[in-house]
Swiss-Prot record:
Gene Ontology CC terms: endoplasmic reticulum
Protein name, per record: Hsp70 nucleotide exchange factor FES1
Annotated signal peptide: none
Organism, as annotated: Chaetomium globosum (strain ATCC 6205 / CBS 148.51 / DSM 1962 / NBRC 6347 / NRRL 1970)
Repeat region (ARM), residues: 58-99, 118-157, 160-201
Keyword Coiled coil annotated: no
Length: 267
């Protein structure tokens, strides 16, 4: 809010009309502007024009040169909801068990767009939105889990502060669990891996927490979070594990279908 007020003050100063200057030598005492007298061929016909009158030929108004108010400042000025309030409102819909899935997915889409802003992502902590967001990773609906993982990945991408917060909130084990869980929806796995990739890069504590969880899956070697090739190796391994699980489920399904068809053929 303070930032918006400062921006509003700056805008008002830039767009204010300067007061008339006091009369001085060479100025018209009534309006404080220098007068230029022009003479036509008729010696009795003279006209006086302010020297600082705006040009009619440059085609650019003074207002166009002034800075504009961004939507957030306009919302604050006219009483609209702030982005922080929109984030809280979206989370209320996401955690409302009476809300329809369609409305919750719309709220998730809006929430994800809001936290693309670094300031809004950082506000997840003071707004106490981390806990409910991570809680949605365990939602019954796969699409809700997918969107929750997507939002986590967006919030921590290239942001040391939110990476640390995710670690403190216990989000790393949850994401590793989603990325490695047998039978998990493919789209959910992919977004969980995306979130892990964003969470561990250049954040050694998060990388250590992730590899500690992955040790149960045979991938617990120490990895330098600043070595992008090494981090990519872990992420690619996770993707490979996901594909292996998907292929395993598909094979099991194909075998089952084949068995059923053979039984039908035998009559």
């Amino acid at each position: 809010m303070e930032r918006n007020l400062n921006s509003l003050l700056k805008w008002s100063i830039e767009n204010s009309v300067p007061s008339s200057a006091p009369a001085a030598n060479g100025t018209n005492g009534t309006n404080g502007t220098t007068a230029v007298t022009t003479h036509s061929s008729d010696s009795n016909n003279t006209s006086t024009t302010p020297a600082d009158a705006p040009s009619q030929t440059n085609g650019t108004s003074a207002a166009a040169a002034n800075s504009k108010l961004n939507p957030e400042i306009l919302s604050a000025l006219f009483g609209g909801p702030s982005e922080a309030e929109l984030m809280k409102a979206a989370m209320e819909v996401l955690t409302d068990k009476s809300a329809t899935l369609d409305n919750q997915l719309i709220a998730f889409d809006n929430f994800e767009q809001l936290i693309e802003s670094l300031d809004n992502a950082n506000n997840l902590e003071p707004l106490k939105l981390w806990a409910p967001l991570l809680g949605l990773l365990a939602h019954d609906e796969a699409e809700m889990r997918r969107m929750a993982a997507w939002c986590v990945g967006t919030a921590v991408q290239n942001n040391a502060r939110t990476q640390e917060r995710l670690l403190a909130e216990g989000g790393l084990p949850i994401l590793v669990g989603l990325a490695t869980k047998e039978g998990e929806d493919v789209a959910v796995r992919r977004k969980a891996i995306y979130a892990l990739s964003s969470a561990v890069r250049n954040c050694q504590p998060a990388m250590d927490a992730a590899t500690a969880e992955l040790s149960a899956h045979g991938k617990g070697d120490k990895v330098d979070a600043g070595d992008m090739d090494a981090v990519d190796g872990v992420i690619e391994w996770l993707r490979g594990e996901g594909e292996r699980c998907v292929n395993g489920v598909k094979t099991f399904y194909d075998v089952g279908i084949g068995y059923q068809r053979r039984r039908e053929e035998r009559g």
